[in-house]
């Protein structure tokens, strides 16, 4: 058995149980690590390792003076995830103790470690303990003032109602300006697909209400009109960057599963949480091997919402519906189909929903109906052809309404996103040139690819376009064969006339050049795509060049799993494509 990924859990997490309902210091923190099978190992070896681990942890904890009660061992098909609750001012020592107990139990570490020294660990624990910090956090919880704690300092309150102290500085309770500290309205957004678009919709709605908005996503951090960071900031670091900024009056935070699994939920006590959907993507990390386990991870943000807040869920996702009963905050469902059984039952029980009724985005609460905006007036919905973006618009509308945004702000936010690069960065970008239609979409998992291609098929049917369908695809090297099979099945179901499989340079993740495209080609053939219509490309620009050279007026090109945005943009400009 191998030991891997020892880490601190600094917020609400899927391993150490916390009561539903955010705020008030209810989240249980601690430390965790993975125990992974070596080749040929199985449950028997794990049984033995767990027995020894519990004994070694108890003995070492007693020697060091660290409580070790409440060890959690969650088994999965590649081993187990181990978690230990610990006080916030003991986490660094606790991770050392847990890791050492694992080594003493016979688990092989990922790197050499020095001999265990219980006396040194005990001294480290005493140095780490910080009664002033504990008292401060207890007082903040009593006053319902949110706290953010990390290596770069501690902050109390959020946004314009926050104060931050640098690393090593912990103020006395009496020195804190408590009357100036508190919450700002926060929306958390997660899900397998639609996170970024929904977050962008929400940020647009907030801006339209006239407030300074902090937003995070896989595209960066934006405060007001300033792009503070670029790249993927959908983890805890992005949330801290926004909520420690004293300009921020409202926040829309994309919350990816990676950060939830590595560190826990950074923000406890948000006003609203949105879970768009859960499907097959990123399985296998940190012991999450099936969609049900992933749903539990995604729903962490729902349990972190204040009891007087709101949780927005997809009525068409049975995994989310099944978990709604355990959420402390009220539920609002969204659905394209206003007659969906979950929607009908929820309304009958007095619950709120956001649906499409007679072509109009509509909020329903009991007998009251509020018409928001016709789908035809939401650019990214393409008259309803982009069903996935209709769902994103519904989710954002429900969340914005729950935060108290006025209807005109909801409308402005829905109109604000258009199919251009600056707005969407590779999500549902549709362009046309000389009779050829091009879709650039980040879709990279089976559900996302199926949704993107279904959208194109609806556009083609609506516009009576008889031409061919050319699909460009690829994958990162860490994608499982199950994920690749699902993506290839979705491509095959669209009956493409030409498929170009490209290498994603920089994303091979340990695979040899050509290895991933060869796997994709094999899965495409098994799914029913004729070998003669499959070509290979060296990268994004090469693949798109092949596709556009082949395309004729009336044809549709779908470039999925879009990576090299600037390079593709330059290529299209050089070929005369309008932005």
Regions found by a protein language model. Give the residues of each.
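Short polybasic amphipathic segments
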Residues: 153-158, 219-223, 359-366
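Residue-level signal for inorganic ion chemistry
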Residues: 140, 216, 254, 276, ...
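Preference for protein termini
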Residues: 1-185, 208-209, 213
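Adenine nucleotide phosphate-binding catalytic loops in nucleotide-utilizing enzymes
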Residues: 288-295, 299, 329-450
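ATP-dependent carboxylate-amine ligase
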Residues: 1-64, 68-71, 76-78, 386, ...
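Gly-rich Lys/Arg/Thr-decorated short loops/hinges at beta-loop-alpha junctions or inter-strand turns
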Residues: 182-186, 215-224, 271-283, 375-377, ...
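Walker A (P-loop) phosphate-binding motif
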Residues: 175-219, 227
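Flexible active-site lid/hinge loop adjacent to a nucleotide/diphosphate
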Residues: 223-333, 338-342, 377-382
């Amino acid at each position: 058995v191998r030991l891997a990924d020892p880490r601190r859990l600094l917020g609400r997490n899927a391993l150490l149980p916390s009561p539903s309902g955010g705020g008030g210091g209810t989240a249980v923190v601690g430390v965790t690590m993975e125990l992974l099978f070596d080749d040929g190992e199985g449950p028997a070896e794990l049984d033995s390792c767990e027995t020894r681990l519990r004994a070694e942890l108890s003995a070492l904890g007693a020697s060091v003076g660290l409580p070790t009660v409440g060890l959690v061992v969650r088994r999965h098909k590649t081993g187990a995830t181990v978690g230990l609750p610990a006080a916030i001012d003991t986490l660094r020592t606790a991770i050392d103790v847990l890791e050492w107990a694992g080594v003493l139990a016979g688990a092989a570490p990922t790197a050499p470690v020095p001999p265990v020294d219980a006396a040194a660990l005990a001294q480290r624990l005493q140095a780490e303990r910080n009664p002033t910090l504990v008292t401060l956090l207890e007082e903040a919880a009593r006053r319902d003032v949110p706290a953010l704690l990390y290596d770069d300092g501690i902050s109390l309150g959020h946004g314009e109602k926050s104060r931050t102290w640098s690393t090593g500085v912990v103020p006395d309770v009496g020195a804190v300006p408590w009357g100036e500290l508190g919450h700002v309205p926060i929306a958390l957004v997660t899900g397998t697909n639609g996170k970024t678009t929904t977050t962008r919709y929400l940020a647009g709605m907030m801006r339209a209400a006239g407030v300074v908005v902090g937003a995070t996503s896989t595209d960066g951090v934006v405060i007001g009109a300033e792009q503070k960071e670029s790249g993927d900031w959908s983890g805890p670091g992005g949330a801290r960057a926004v909520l420690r900024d004293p300009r921020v009056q409202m926040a829309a935070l994309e919350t990816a599963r990676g950060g939830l699994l590595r560190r826990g939920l950074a923000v406890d006590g948000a006003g609203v949480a949105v879970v768009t959907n859960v499907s097959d993507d990123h399985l296998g990390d940190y012991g999450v091997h099936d969609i049900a386990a992933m749903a539990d991870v995604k729903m962490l943000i729902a349990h972190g919402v204040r009891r007087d807040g709101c949780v927005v869920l997809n009525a068409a996702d049975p995994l989310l519906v099944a978990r709604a009963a355990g959420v402390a905050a009220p539920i609002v469902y969204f659905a394209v189909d206003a007659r969906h059984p979950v929607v009908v039952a929820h309304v009958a029980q007095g619950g709120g929903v956001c649906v499409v009724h007679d072509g109009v985005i509509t909020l329903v609460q009991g007998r009251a109906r509020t018409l928001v905006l016709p789908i035809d007036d939401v650019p990214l919905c393409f008259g309803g052809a982009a069903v996935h973006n209709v769902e994103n618009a519904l989710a954002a509308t429900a969340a914005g309404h729950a935060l108290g945004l006025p209807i005109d702000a909801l409308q402005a936010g829905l109109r604000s996103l258009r199919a251009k690069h600056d707005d969407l960065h590779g999500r549902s970008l549709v362009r046309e040139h000389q009779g050829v239609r091009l879709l650039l979409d980040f879709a990279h998992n089976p559900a996302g690819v199926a949704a993107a291609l279904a959208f194109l098929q609806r556009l083609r049917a609506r516009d009576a376009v008889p031409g061919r369908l050319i699909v460009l695809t690829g994958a990162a090297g860490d994608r499982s064969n199950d994920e690749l099979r699902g993506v290839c099945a979705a491509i095959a179901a669209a009956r493409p006339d030409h498929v170009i499989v490209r290498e994603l340079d920089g994303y091979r993740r340990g695979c040899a050049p050509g290895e991933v495209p060869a796997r994709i080609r094999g899965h495409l053939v098994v799914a029913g795509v004729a070998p003669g219509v499959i070509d290979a490309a060296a990268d994004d620009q090469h693949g798109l060049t092949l596709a556009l050279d082949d395309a004729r007026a009336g044809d549709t090109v779908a470039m999925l799993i879009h990576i090299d945005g600037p390079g593709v943009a330059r290529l299209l400009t050089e070929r005369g494509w309008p932005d």
